[in-house]
Design a protein with these regions (language model features):
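Small-residue-rich segments within alpha-helical transmembrane domains of MFS-like 12-TM solute carriers
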Residues: 24, 28, 110-118, 144-148
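Hydrophobic core of transmembrane alpha-helices in multi-pass small-molecule transporters
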Residues: 21, 89, 100-115
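Cytosolic juxtamembrane N-terminal segment immediately preceding the first transmembrane helix
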Residues: 1-19, 23, 206, 210-214
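Helix-loop-helix hairpin linking two adjacent transmembrane segments in secondary transporters
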Residues: 138-190
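Extracytoplasmic
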Residues: 11-45, 49, 62-66, 150-151
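Flexible cytoplasmic inter-helical loops of multi-pass small-molecule transporters
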Residues: 186-211
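Intracellular juxtamembrane helix-capping segments at the cytosolic ends
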Residues: 115-128, 136
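Conserved MFS/SLC helix-loop-helix module at the cytosolic interface between two early adjacent transmembrane helices
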Residues: 61-100
Length: 214
């Protein structure tokens, strides 16, 4: 049975895109709440940006580490692990009383968030051959959908309850959306299909090299 570019491949892409849209908010949340934490902790803008800086450091490190975990344990277990890390981080962030503790927590949130970017993109790419380019582009856009969709949803919570409740909403969304969706990604591509994919990738690389030489 054909696995590449199949109906299931597109279904899997849709699920992965939903996971990415929820999972990647860990990168954007601190940007959304930045004015509020600046005001509450009475700090300047440069100090208030420390949580975002450490989020990106955690995100960069997490892409490599989470990628290795995917290689060993599969995408479902990796997403569940990342969801647990982020949920604990969100709940802990609700309790902090200074920007430095928040920054440390955002490092771990960024680390967990990484599972919803590079590793998820790589896993999705295995299910496509002819349409791999558009599939990778679509799943990568989950990061930006996250940054576009969630901020407007948080406006009322920020105005009425404050930034801590935003973290509470994210903790609930991560547990009740990401984890259930991850179980729909448990199926692994067959070794035969994987070999076909690897052979096609190798041929593309050789063609590119020959083109450069010519």
């Amino acid at each position: 049975m054909k696995e590449h570019d199949s109906l299931y491949s597109w279904f899997r892409l849709l699920i992965a895109l939903l996971v990415a849209t929820v999972g990647n908010i860990g990168m954007w949340v601190v940007v959304i709440i930045l004015p509020d934490i600046q005001q509450e902790f009475t700090i300047d803008r440069s100090t208030a940006s420390i949580p975002f800086a450490l989020t990106m450091v955690g995100f960069a490190i997490g892409n490599g580490v989470m990628g290795r975990i995917v290689d060993h344990y599969g995408i479902t277990k990796t997403i569940i692990l990342a969801a647990i890390i982020n949920t604990v981080g969100y709940i802990a962030a609700m309790q902090v009383n200074n920007v430095y503790l928040l920054s440390i927590l955002q490092f771990f949130i960024g680390f967990g968030t990484a599972a919803s970017f590079g590793p998820l993109i790589a896993d999705t790419s295995h299910w496509f051959l002819k349409r791999r380019g558009i599939a990778v582009a679509l799943i990568a856009s989950g990061n930006y959908f996250s940054g576009a969709i969630w901020p407007p949803l948080f406006n009322s919570a920020l105005q009425s309850d404050g930034w801590r409740d935003v973290y509470g909403i994210l903790a609930l969304a991560t547990i009740f959306i990401m984890i259930p969706l991850s179980f729909l990604l448990t199926k692994k591509i067959s070794e035969e299909t994987s070999r076909v994919s690897d052979a096609a990738s190798l041929k593309t690389q050789k063609d590119l090299l020959m083109g450069k030489r010519n």
